[in-house]
Amino acid sequence: MIFDTHAHYDDQAFDADREELLSGLFENGVGYVLDASAAVRNMPFILELTKRYDFLYGSAGIHPCEAYQSGDNAGKPVMKKRTSGEWGFGLLVLEALNRYEEGEIITPDWRAGDREEQLIRAMLAEPKIMAVGEIGLDYHYEDTQKDVQKDWFARQISIAREFHRPIFVHSRDAAADTLDMIRAEKAQEAGGIIHCFSYSKEMAREYVDLGFYIGIGGVLTYKNAKKLKEVAAYVPMDHIVLETDCPYLAPSPFRGKRNDSSLIRYTAEVLAQIKGLSAEEVIQITEENACRVYGVCK
């Protein structure tokens, strides 16, 4: 069945029909979904979703474009006091969330971001939080704080290694720095996925040689996706996973509309044409790959 290795069902784009959509995914051939954390404010709801849906798993992490909103660089997020019965959270996450809201300094050697780190660690103690992500570097915007992003990337790689969890990496306009940090921080010891891969086939080979998987989504179906099609042809099938990044990056013919996990089939069909396989073979192989990464399949 389809394994969507990177989705954002906590996004407000799904507020109107989230329950109906998620409840119908199995009928549309979707067996597993990993809901990707992007910021502190997303983590509570992601955890709630993992408890509500058997097939849905989650991650804990801070997106590079959210890194400046953490630690000393942010106001506190709006979070009401929670009780374990109300939200169904494990006690570690409950305690971390409430301490985070109160702004409590948890350790004597506190530094900017320690509360966020404690929350990530608490999330990883939950049985269905399977990875650290989405983390990485994004230099697309002019006001990018590269040092802050690098600091958070390094911290979160360290947490992943500590917990023996895979990472999934967001990298945009930061090819060299991302690979350099992956090597310097020994991220290959954690392993994981290079999400929404957008670089050359030569760069893909560097990651595959380190043991990483290449995440491919709806962009593969676009007419102007020549470079990604070259990557897809070059990377061995046993190092490719499928993803949506929904609600973003819907495949053709749905480009510009809201994406969801059932639409992965369109990406699988294009990848199948490139690889000389059937769409069902692509779905099966990429499911097996994702199972190896996240360790969730029964």
What are these regions (language model features)?
Residues 1-298:
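Mid-domain alpha/beta scaffold segments of enzyme catalytic cores
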